[in-house]
Amino acid sequence: MNNNDQIVWCDIPVKDLDRAIKFYGAVLDQPIKKESHEGMSFGLLPHPHDGVGGCLVISKEAQPSANGPLVYLNCINRLDAAIAAVEKNGGKILQPKHQIGPYGSRAVILDSEGNRIALHSK
């Protein structure tokens, strides 16, 4: 992460942490590490040590929602495989894969918890 990054972290709210870890592990084709810190369990999304990251978290303050900010997850070189894993793992395709100008392609999905998420590839 450099000092010019505007987004540095995201928490994706979930209802069932184990179900969400399974869903995101399948869609991203990477292990989601379950951790616990100060009595709070969360699923750590893969990210470089010095890069933008995020986690799956159960929270009283935030509930899964299809309304609100749209988080884009990196599916570079495997967007089609990620999309194919969505419905098999309890999600739903809201917008099929489409071009977003010079910024690549995306599909907008509903994850296993009810969050609207974009899967993105350049």
Task: Report residues per predicted region.
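Short acidic/glycine-enriched loop/turn segments that link adjacent beta-strands
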Residues: H37-S41, I100-S105
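Core segments of cupin and vicinal oxygen chelate
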Residues: N2, D11-V52
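Active-site beta-strand termini and strand-to-loop segments that position acidic
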Residues: L45-H49, I109-S112, K122
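Conserved active-site tyrosine of GNAT-family acetyltransferases
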Residues: A20-Y24, V86, G114
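Vicinal oxygen chelate
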Residues: Q6-K15, E61-E87, S105-L110
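Short, charged/polar, Gly/Pro-enriched secondary-structure boundary elements
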Residues: D50-G54, N115-I117
